[in-house]
Amino acid sequence: MLTPVYEEQFHDHSYGFRPNRCAQQAIITALDRMNDGYDWIVDIDLEKFFDTVNHDKLMTLMGKTIKDGEVISIIRKFPASGIKEDDEYRESVIGTRQGGNLSPLLANIMRNELDKEMEQRGLNFVRYADDCINMVGSEMSAKRVMRNITRFIEEKLGLKVNTTKSKVDK
């Protein structure tokens, strides 16, 4: 029910966990951009994405598309997996179940905000799940993209960039 609604909104350069899309298509798109002269790579990896998704931010994003309050209420229960510590259960306001049926869609809804931001900035990018690469023409541009997109991810989406795995390279 939700997938067709959101598929219309998802960016063409988003390939992870989507119908009729695969990693090979993402690689082909990236190679095409590199062959066009965009040979500096900004490789951005999100740190522990499923553990750090803010439920309120996600529900706000979903509320822009889904207007039925009952549907939102049902969906809100899904990511609130809670935490069990010392034999005591408490609700969690961040994170979503990794491996759950709805998790990939919820993840793409959140990460679609990143896709829209990169498109608005005119970037050549490919995203597969929580890995994103931007292809640019110079080292200076690559460093600027890394800095600005990292700031967007952390300040606007409330997510964390994995600085160990993320890099600028040619």
Task: Identify the meaning behind each predicted range.
Residues 1-4, 17:
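Accessory, often N-terminal, substrate/partner-engagement and coupling regions
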Residues 9-21, 25-170:
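Conserved polymerase palm-domain catalytic core
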